[in-house]
Amino acid sequence: FPNNHENLEDYQRTLKYAYLYAKTVTLGKTHWPDTNRVMLRNRRIGCSVSGVAQFITNKGLEELKVWLEKGYDVIQEWDGMYSDWFAIPKSIKTTSVKPSGTVSLLVGATPGMHYPESRFYIRRMRLSKHSELIDPLKKAGYKVEPAFGSEDSTVVVEVPIDVGEGIRTAAELSIWEQFSLAAFLQRHWADNQVSCTATFDPETEADELPHVLNYFQYRLKGISLLPRHELGAYKQMPYEAITEKEYEKQVKKLGYLSFVGVEGEQAEVDKFCNNDVCEIPLMSETI
């Protein structure tokens, strides 16, 4: 989250610890031998940036370019140093731009490289219907409903959001500008694929798609496309634009949200198991 840092040095310090965490993960072992062989060889990681739209709004595109390039260089320096210390290969890929939707909510950042749907919008999140978070959310006035298509196992929670003044919205960006930003991040930061879902107006921009894809096929590793519709492309979309009046109406319904007494949820995972059969690695004795 570069926009959450006071200066470049502060940001580079965060990158160091993000890199160390990611690199340390590659020292572990999965229960898939094929995966282990690839990971031992490639040590592939992906330190991501998020809140890109906010950084551009506050500091400009040129400053973002400087931060990204210097940040990328410092990650390569750390990778060279720590790979030598660990006696392992340098990572073939080190940087990325991930969607970071839910994670971005925790720090008040826009997700990944994406601009907000509008200044005011509904953010929907999916939870297990057995989650201990549901009752506190309902008591605080948040709308909770069954997830379409997964009614037996999942619920969707709606949260009204105001991203503040000044920042542009996704509807204000042409399909060309969205592709250009993705290509900018691919060039100046990410050696993994940039995660980008470019939205477009099907009535005015649909004919542009063959041309924009043709031009950017040499500058992007991949991209997703989503048409913008007034009622949304599908039910319970993650982001839905609303008016300021609707936002204020939703906020007035909300009370105090307290998670006191809610215990953390730990996923139960059967390691090294396939159905009812488990693989137990044998430890050979060294004489």
Q: Model-derived features: where do they sit?
A:
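Electropositive phosphate-/nucleotide-binding environments in soluble metabolic enzymes
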Residues: 12, 46, 69, 73, ...
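Short, solvent-exposed segments of well-ordered alpha helices
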Residues: 36-39, 43
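Catalytic-loop motifs flanking and including active-site residues across diverse enzymes
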Residues: 44, 48-51
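Hydrophobic, well-ordered secondary-structure elements that form the walls
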Residues: 52, 101, 216, 278
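Short capping micro-motif at the N-terminus of alpha-helices
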Residues: 92, 105-106
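Short acidic, low-complexity intrinsically disordered linear motifs used
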Residues: 265-287
